[in-house]
Amino acid sequence: MEPELEHTLPGTLTWSHSGGPESQEMDFLEQGENSWPSPAVATSSERTCAIRGVKASRWTRQEAVEEAEPPGLGEGAQSRPAAESTRQEATFPKATPLAQAVPLAEAETSPTGWDLLLPDCAASAGGSSTGDLELTIEFPAPEAWDCELEGLGKDRPRPGPSPQAPLLGLSWDDELQKPGAQVYMHFMQEHTCYDAMATSSKLVIFDTTLEIKKAFFAMVANGVRAAPLWDSKKQSFVGMLTITDFILVLHRYYRSPLVQIYEIEEHKIETWREIYLQGCFKPLVSISPNDSLFEAVYALIKNRIHRLPVLDPVSGTVLYILTHKRLLKFLHIFGALLPRPSFLCRTIQDLGIGTFRDLAVVLETAPVLTALDIFVDRRVSALPVVNESGQVVGLYSRFDVIHLAAQQTYNHLDMSVGEALRQRTLCLEGVLSCQPHESLGEVIDRIAREQVHRLVLVDETQHLLGVVSLSDILQALVLSPAGIDALSA
């Protein structure tokens, strides 16, 4: 008998939302009113502000927040239950404890010392409210997705011209020394992964005895890009099945003349992992709901993964899967309640946030197989598609590759990347981009509003200059103020 696609785990979840009115958290992805649980309520039902001594009321679209100090800035580090290790856990470096941050009420300077929003920066503050975000469902149309996965490889071809990097300023270190530059770092240290979890969401789990072909088709049918793998023999989660695995299947098939595609398709997931990925896959990296969002950001960027399972510390059950996009959206929504750092008004070119050199690109005339080679070798999640003049004409992501399975066209990897983009069910008009003169605040607002994972940095003639990704932004807002560079580690 074939195992079910959605594996039901024994046991009862120990983490659940209480039924009281103070804890009925509206999931913004499932509810039409775009409501989130207030982080102040999620971590402490009542929070006394350091300045005026008033309570912050529950925050939704229908309720206004009373004027108060931003949550998490006026008190010491919160005591939380220690996270129990259920899988491999990342080692997190020492960051500035929240208790060492100077409370606003005790500072000798006035509130203007936090570098609040200047009048000339008011335009970049637009779109910071939840009303500007199109927050609908957890899994939007697959064609609008970009892949967020990892990959492995050897040889990389060199398609496309080498883009010119903009002249970068050296002011980012100076900005981090200004008062208020650590406000987002403290916010993410103060709140836990439980705060960012949805009240209700879809979670697809595969048993390792499932055939790999059926698993990939199930991912397409359910609109997911990754699924936890359950080993019934070990009675534990052993990893994640991602689109990277599908890319590796195609890559091995095309690069090995003696291997037939149907032979790989009929393999079980456990066979694929043991034979074809021998020595390549790593133990599952997970996190506890008690751990801070700061640790979640570090684990995602440090391990170069795009899915971080939240495991129950007692039962080991997967409760939720955190992503870069979920964390930035959480920070973007509640960041409107925090003092606005001055660096949000600085331009991308001045701050140097993003990737500007040694960019992975692909020519629109190159075959899809060339794009697969770059995905495997460079471990990137998307490739800017350029023409012979170096102008950006599209964006080919890892998730576009799995469309080959949905359309039964994965035997035709010799088609051009441009043709593959035109065959997508959903044809996107243009490429979401930004320019060097735009401020960091404007870029963050656009990424959150459009629900994308990156913006392509171009000049006035649409020539490629760089890429600004979610990892770049989270590194700058959360980890850099703590003196941590997880991107280069």
Swiss-Prot record:
Where does this protein hold AMP 2?
R225, K325, S397, R398, F399, D400, R424, L432, H453, R454
Q: Which SUPFAM superfamilies match?
A: CBS-domain pair
Q: Which residues bind ADP 2?
A: R225, K325, S397, R398, F399, D400, R424, L432, H453, R454
A GO CC annotation given for this chain:
nucleotide-activated protein kinase complex
* A GO molecular function held by the record: AMP-activated protein kinase activity
**A GO term (biological process) for this protein?**
response to muscle activity involved in regulation of muscle adaptation
Q: Which UniProt keywords apply?
A: ATP-binding, CBS domain, Fatty acid biosynthesis, Fatty acid metabolism, Glycoprotein, Lipid biosynthesis, Lipid metabolism, Nucleotide-binding, Phosphoprotein, Repeat
Annotated binding of AMP 1, by residue? M240, L241, T242, I243, T244, D245, V285, H306, R307
Q: Which sites bind AMP 3?
A: H306, T355, A360, S381, A382, H453, S469, L470, S471, D472
Residue segments, region Disordered: 1-95
For binding ATP 1, which residues are annotated in this chain's numbering? R225, M240, L241, T242, I243, T244, D245, V285, H306, R307
Record-listed ATP 2 binding positions: R225, R307, K325, S397, R398, F399, D400, R424, L432, H453, R454
Q: Where is the CBS domain?
A: 197-258, 280-340, 355-415, 427-486
Instruction: Write down the PROSITE patterns for this protein, in alphabetical order.
Output: CBS (PS51371)
Q: Name one Pfam family in it.
A: CBS
User: Which portions of the chain have biased composition (kind: Polar residues)?
Assistant: 32-47
Sequence motif AMPK pseudosubstrate, location on chain: 293-314
Q: How is it modified after translation?
A: Phosphorylated by ULK1; leading to negatively regulate AMPK activity and suggesting the existence of a regulatory feedback loop between ULK1 and AMPK.
Membership in a protein family: Belongs to the 5'-AMP-activated protein kinase gamma subunit family.
Q: What is known of its domains?
A: The AMPK pseudosubstrate motif resembles the sequence around sites phosphorylated on target proteins of AMPK, except the presence of a non-phosphorylatable residue in place of Ser. In the absence of AMP this pseudosubstrate sequence may bind to the active site groove on the alpha subunit (PRKAA1 or PRKAA2), preventing phosphorylation by the upstream activating kinase STK11/LKB1.
Question: Self-association or partners: how does it assemble?
Answer: AMPK is a heterotrimer of an alpha catalytic subunit (PRKAA1 or PRKAA2), a beta (PRKAB1 or PRKAB2) and a gamma non-catalytic subunits (PRKAG1, PRKAG2 or PRKAG3). Interacts with FNIP1 and FNIP2.
Q: What does this protein do?
A: AMP/ATP-binding subunit of AMP-activated protein kinase (AMPK), an energy sensor protein kinase that plays a key role in regulating cellular energy metabolism. In response to reduction of intracellular ATP levels, AMPK activates energy-producing pathways and inhibits energy-consuming processes: inhibits protein, carbohydrate and lipid biosynthesis, as well as cell growth and proliferation. AMPK acts via direct phosphorylation of metabolic enzymes, and by longer-term effects via phosphorylation of transcription regulators.
- What is the protein named? 5'-AMP-activated protein kinase subunit gamma-3
What species was this sequence derived from? Answer: Mus musculus (Mouse)
The beginning of the lineage is: Eukaryota, Metazoa, Chordata, Craniata, Vertebrata
* Gene name as annotated: Prkag3
